[in-house]
Amino acid sequence: DSCCIEQHCCD
């Protein structure tokens, strides 16, 4: 899945 925290996202 994808995670987004503040200005950075990881998929």
UniProtKB/Swiss-Prot annotation:
Role noted for this protein: Probable toxin that inhibits ion channels.
Q: How is it modified after translation?
A: Contains 2 disulfide bonds that can be either 'C1-C3, C2-C4' or 'C1-C4, C2-C3', since these disulfide connectivities have been observed for conotoxins with cysteine framework V (for examples, see AC P0DQQ7 and AC P81755).
- Name of the protein in its database record: Conotoxin Ama1251
UniProt KW keywords: Disulfide bond, Ion channel impairing toxin, Secreted, Toxin
Source organism, top-level taxon = Eukaryota
Q: In which tissues is it expressed?
A: Expressed by the venom duct.
Q: Name one GO molecular function term.
A: ion channel regulator activity
- Domain comment in the entry: The cysteine framework is V (CC-CC).
Cellular component GO terms, alphabetically?
extracellular region
Location comes to: Secreted
Keyword Disulfide bond listed = yes
